[in-house]
């Protein structure tokens, strides 16, 4: 299950995490964001990646800091740094490829 993060919890939940973290930048009014959410849950489960969500309407500063111009935007963080990103609701395999996760066994 995804964890909602705010500017106050982002450093602890994402930047200081020991494992890779997939950050889903989304909004309540965004249909494609809701459509891709279960796909992201599966990717996180299959690849042992922590999944967190940032509501861009509530956390505009975070969205600006990471250059989020459209949603959904998913950014994979490794060792506290953005490692890969994908924009838009895409099929599971395309998201995995874009994030460099490969195919789960």
Region locations from a protein language model:
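A short beta-strand-turn-helix
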Residues: 3-21, 60-61
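Thiol-based oxidoreductase modules, predominantly thioredoxin-like and allied folds used
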Residues: 5-6, 25, 37-61, 68
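Conserved hydrophobic/aromatic "anchor" residues
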Residues: 10, 25-26, 66, 77
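Short pre-active-site segment immediately N-terminal to redox-active cysteine/selenocysteine motifs
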Residues: 18-19, 25-29, 70
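Structural signature of beta-strand start/N-cap positions in the alpha/beta core
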Residues: 19, 48-50, 72
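The canonical Cys-X-X-Cys-His
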Residues: 30-33, 74
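Non-catalytic, surface beta->alpha helical segment in thiol-disulfide oxidoreductase systems
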Residues: 75-105
